[in-house]
Amino acid sequence: MFHCERRNTMANKNHVKLGVAAAAAVAAGATAIVSKNKKEARKKEVAKRVSNFRNTERGRFERNSKGIYYSNGNYEAFARPLKPEGVDEKSAYIVGSGLGALAAACFLVRDGQMKGERIHVLEAMDLPGGACDGIFDPSRGYIMRGGREMENHFECLWDLFRSIPSIETPGVSVLDEYYWLNKKDPNYSLCRATVKQGEDAHTDGKFNLSQKGCMEIMKLFMTKDEDLYDKTIEDVFDDEVFDSTFWLYWLTMFAFENWHSALEMKLYFQRFIHHIGGLPDFSALKFTKYNQYESLILPMIKYLEVAGVQFQYKTQVTNVIFEKTEDGKKIARTIECKVDGEETTIALTEKDLVFVTNGSCTEGTIYGDHTHAPTGDAEVRRSGCWSLWKNIAAQDASFGHPEKFCSDIDKTNWESATVTTSNQQIIDQIQKICKRDPRTGNVVTGGIVSCMDSKWLLSWTINRQGQFKEQKKDEVCIWVYSLFTDVEGDYVKKPMKECTGEEITQEWLYHLGIPVEDIPALAKDEVVTVPTMMPYITAFFMPRRKGDRPDVIPDGCVNFAFLGQFAETPRDTIFTTEYSVRTAMEAVYGLLKVDRGVPEVWGSVYDIRELLDSTVKLMDGKSPLDIELPGPLNALKLPLLKAVKGTVIEKLLKEHQIIQ
């Protein structure tokens, strides 16, 4: 009986196994059929797409949803657009008079061909220029809150200034003057950094990055934008980068700090990849003859005044009120403002175009003088651009999120000071460091000199003198700034933000190498220093994500655009004159439908030659073939070299020192 039961059990098990096997076979067959059907369907789809494909460039330059298209090359650059349809019935209201606002007015006149009397610039202060300042204050002295570093591929900036007449030389443009000046007197530094009270740090054009540091930078370079939303630089780099000379160059030149946006850091790499080699000695940079107010702003003001543009000062715009229609349109209907302190409104139609500078890096600037520190409550003085943007943003999500940028002044501030002296002892020490006479009118430091061992991380620079047209011949104006304003100094035992101009001078003279016993008298009697604390100077570097900055022309807007450093435009980088002018060009071209391309951001990031060059330079002359690459990449070196041998690729790799 037992054997019979066992045979039956085994038979049942075999039947089960056969059943499972049969089911598996059926399933496998079905899967194979489904897979085959999918492949056949995919083949048909590809065949259909290919059969419908036609090579053409029609539509290549059609406007995008914002009413613009991007272009490159001389054909578009030298062409003048036709007069936009209906422009004679339109008016423009421009809020602010900084570089972006004035550029918008210039583009309205030149390319939009709008009559000057129909363009209204509304400025809260009694002086134009915004952050591009440069002034002599009789009660304080010369004041420059900052300087402007420029390069040859600021495509929109130079497109504008080729048309702005010089106010010094009849018959030439601002660009002509600038071009000739920088050809005759090219910029470069002979001492990038000092240590031990004025000794050359001998950075010697090296980045001093480890292999791991280079790989961290390359990884960031290739990371998608969306993977960097709300991330800081500390999230993507470690001490392999932060302890390098590269990082000293980077944070002192661009004012990046460890807690700033990793996304913006990546964009900077990509935007200026063609200038990596010029980073250590500033040979990539170009500067104006005078301060940016006299060199850039005043010629624009003159151009606009001649065209009949209306400037209305002491007019603080507090809000723009929108109507939203059922079909998704957003129409600016009212400008709310205060004129000389009295509240008033400006009624708008769809034919009234409104351009608003949202946010400002110099809003709430606190001024000191030689005997007073720049102390005050920045929160109280946030009533201008920031509150205007907040009021606008409260009406629609597409208008951005200003609080992402202006809510933490401990992370967005730094302080600068303008130092003026004619003392020979100080000037001799300057000349010893920068190896140039500051009084020749030519390049002096060629960019900032950073004091590597300064607790404040103090840097200073002297541009061509005089920086002001009215400056005395024996006077030298020095610009000093520090990134770490809340730590005590090396000579002055207090934070920079608590220091008077005299005390800041003492700290600077100490790092300059002036004998310690001479510092007090020189700082008190031989120098005039004006400090300026800027609570939001690096607000645009704060970590962000898509939507935090509004598009230049937000979706649905028919008569409204944003301008400046807190408006979103693809691929370009903030804290540049180019960014302000680019947003202005896009705003005017988009709202007026100007039939001409906006020059695209220079495409060096897509140029294999620049990528090869920059890789070798970042590694201080080494080839990537000389280092251990991760994993299987290392094993691919020889096969790849064999594959390209005798080809134009091998020639290219040799020309750019990949094959050495």
Show which residues each predicted segment covers.
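Short, Lys/Arg-enriched N-terminal segments with co-localized hydrophobic residues
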Residues: 1-9
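Extreme N-terminal leader/targeting segments of oxidoreductases
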Residues: 14-92, 110-118, 618-660
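Glycine-rich Rossmann-fold phosphate-binding loop(s) that bind the pyrophosphate
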Residues: 96-99
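Glycine-rich FAD pyrophosphate-binding loop
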Residues: 109-136
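Conserved FAD-binding subdomain of flavin-dependent enzymes
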Residues: 140-180
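Rossmann-like flavin
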Residues: 166-274, 286-287
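Helical element adjacent to the flavin cofactor pocket in flavoenzyme catalytic cores
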Residues: 270-353, 358-359, 371-372, 377-386
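C-terminal segments that line or cap access tunnels to active or ligand-binding sites in enzymes
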Residues: 273-288, 351-353, 358-585, 589-603
